[in-house]
Structures are given as structure tokens and as C-alpha cells.
């Protein structure tokens, strides 16, 4: 990807929580929800609960949730990857993929997040404002929508259904 700008989310390779390279190309054809997560945020419990509901309901139909821990907002994800995985899998019972901790803003912003923000800027500024900013990505890898941290996952369930191609009329 040297000089070419990415055409879709599938052009990226990220690290999983174990430090292994994961090509997002493996998610081609799936509807993705990309979320920056934190374990010690006031929004944590409600978001994980609703993300789990959506994942359970739609994973068989092609929804994949990609969670990226981030410690940039008041240090609310302070643990190492092992601690984060333990918390997310045990306390929050998440079964969706958890990736390596990333920066979503600043000079060390993960390339994936640079792309997401460029595709769907925020209200007033493109920077990620807080934990649990969510990006909905179509099965062909295009960013469809960006949701603020205060928008609960169940509030945009209809958008997920539409992206999955199964919105009820």
C-alpha cells in the first residue's frame, strides 16, 4: 500500500489482541461495526451489553464487530492486551474480535482510524471525541455511517439491517 491510498477498509492489516497480523480482507462481504472501546468508561457497560445483543442477533447474517481498545480518553483502557482481553471476555462476555490497543487521534493514529475519519468526519471536527465512537462499514468495505459515543448501538439497528440487506419493510 506504499503510495496508493486505501480504496476500502479491506486494504488494511491490523494486529489482533495477541499481536498477530490480521488482514481486514478476511471480512470481505460482511457488514462491519468498528468501535474504539474502553473498559473503565461510563459508557462501557451499556455499549458492551448492546454490542453483544447485536452480535448475537446478526452474526450469522454477516455482522462482524471489530473492537479496538484505546487509552486516549482519560486513561480509561489502562491495561495491557492480556488484561483487556480478560476483562472484555470475562466481565463483558464479548465474543466478537478484540484487536491491539490503538491511538485513534494524534500523531500515532492507527492508519485504519485515519481512513475511517477521512471517510466519515465527525460533527465540527473529524477527531474521535470519546470512547465508543462507532463506524458502520458496508459488505464492500465502504464506510456508511459514523455514530457518536452517546448513540447506543441499538439506536442504529435499522441501519445494520439495511447494510445486511434485510431491512424489514
Swiss-Prot record:
CDD domains, sorted: GSH_Peroxidase
EC category: oxidoreductase
Induction summary: By salt stress and metals. Up-regulated by salicylic acid (SA).
Keywords, alphabetical: Cytoplasm, Nucleus, Oxidoreductase, Peroxidase, Stress response
Places the protein is found: Cytoplasm, Cytosol; Nucleus
Superkingdom, natural source: Eukaryota
Similarity section: Belongs to the glutathione peroxidase family.
Quaternary structure annotation from Swiss-Prot or TrEMBL: Interacts with DJ1A.
Name of this chain's protein: Probable glutathione peroxidase 2
Organism of origin: Arabidopsis thaliana
